[in-house]
Swiss-Prot record:
Naturally occurring in which organism (per UniProt): Granulibacter bethesdensis (strain ATCC BAA-1260 / CGDNIH1)
Residue numbers spanned by region G4: 136-139
Binding residues for GTP: 19-26, 81-85, 136-139
Protein name as catalogued: Elongation factor Tu
Tagged with keyword Protein biosynthesis: yes
InterPro entries: EF-Tu_GTP-bd, EF-Tu_GTPase, EFTu-like_2, EFTU_2, G_TR_CS, P-loop_NTPase, Small_GTP-bd, T_Tr_GTP-bd_dom
Residue ranges of the region described as G1: 19-26
Amino acid sequence: MAKAKFERNKPHCNIGTIGHVDHGKTSLTAAITKVLAETGGATFTAYDQIDKAPEERARGITISTAHVEYETGNRHYAHVDCPGHADYVKNMITGAAQMDGGILVVSAADGPMPQTREHILLARQVGVPALVVFLNKVDMVDDPELLDLVEMEVRELLSSYQFPGDDIPIIKGSALCALEDKNPEIGRDAILKLMEAVDAYIPQPERPLDRPFLMPIEDVFSISGRGTVVTGRIERGEVKVGDEVEIVGLKATSKTTVTGVEMFRKLLDRGEAGDNIGALLRGTKREDVERGQVLAKPGSITPHTKFAAEAYILTKEEGGRHTPFFTNYRPQFYFRTTDVTGVVSLPEGTEMVMPGDNVSMQVELIAPIAMDEGLRFAIREGGRTVGAGVVAKISQ
């Protein structure tokens, strides 16, 4: 059977369901596919198909994630749903499933619970741009005042983590009613209302191509009579012959001009996000550039050594450490293409971090790295991955 061609006639957006265990994330995911299947925007995927998500390995970490896709009148969506709480933590920290927005599912019968908080905090720390709330299981709550109370509680919780709690759309409904074709006003209609809110409220992500040029340097060559060539895969933006670029990280930032772009040994006039290229740099010596630096549009990114991070520490079974670590732990932090040693400081009240924990921590690197908030990294000991993290806030 021929593979269906992926039609790219609508803007694409990546979203996911987050929230406390048993509040109905997977039922909601199934309900969205069921309701949108009526108009041909999805293939109905039943609860048990989503629930037995296959295991994937991202950066050496095992994560179970279910992927479904669907479309509304406005957009094409890739939607991720994880069976277990630990899978969410790993997914959000490693960025294995990039989220342009999230649907926070809260059971109206229980209100916000510990993992509701933790997922909102993670969404804030890893930079999920926007959330929409589905207040699920409203068929189990008879008292409308109670519903209003839960809604208020959710809004306050969102605001306490710097999300615009007063403005975030909260849709009340029942995923189960939608799946069982009961009470359309809280079933099918609520799902359609939710998708309208997702369409309208979650901003369309900027395509990598439209962002300022950045290429992590993987290798450096000297070509006699022509100069120095750096190679790598363009992460974002585009580069043209004649563009001025900065070399950022590890040493003092320097400026140069791209005098040639080649791909597969052919000369091009430009390279764009996703391309593996070689860039010829004017007047740059072979020893001025090294793997681990980046080539970037001038002024678009700066080098830093100190930042706050959110990290997940692998279990022994995942190939991680067998023992806890403490403040002043000194592993290597692997950013893009290179390892840099750094010192970890744990927050007040955290004595130690056990394998399998996720933790907020401060890091100080021994050499500066070009970074933005949201940049992912691996934590390594002698080339072995023992954790994964994301830059939450740059301090210096």
